[in-house]
Amino acid sequence: MKLNELRDNEGARYQSKRLGRGIGSGKGKTSGKGVKGQTSRTGVAINGFEGGQMPIYRRLPKRGFHNPNAKHFAVINLGRLQKAIDEKRIDAKATITAEILSAAGLIGKVLDGVRLLGHGEIKAKVSIEVTGASAAAIAAVEKAGGSVTVAAPKAVAEG
């Protein structure tokens, strides 16, 4: 068998039947939609309509709320930070900031700042500047000989 002899199995691919192309096609006139009524027309499905039965979105109670004052931090764990240092994506000698973490691809968009968490291990002596840090993360960095500076987030200029 050669590459130019490869073929699909018989019946593996077939052309879909064209609709509304005459009586002889088997799908002419009404195109298999029957006669009149809601389902014969466009935009048939009414979202959430369950045939008159009380829909699930009305049977279940409302829960919770959206807190407009919630803070959204970009999170970085010690293990990922150490891995980036080992891979030479971050220079451990320089002060590590949100900009450096973002450039290294460790965090996404910084909304209300960066929060350092203590999952994983840090061996490098680092100086890191973040807007929030867990007690475990601070203890681990200081044990490795580094320092954590918790600073207020920089105000984003509105305009």
Curated annotation (Swiss-Prot):
Ranges for region Disordered: 1-40
Basic and acidic residues bias (residue ranges): 1-11
Listed GO MF terms: rRNA binding; structural constituent of ribosome
Start-end of Gly residues biased regions: 21-35
Disulfide pattern: none
Keyword RNA-binding assigned: yes
GO CC annotation, single: cytosolic large ribosomal subunit
Any GO BP annotation: translation
Biological function: Binds to the 23S rRNA.
NCBIfam families: rplO_bact (TIGR01071)
Entry protein name: Large ribosomal subunit protein uL15
Gene from which the chain derives: rplO
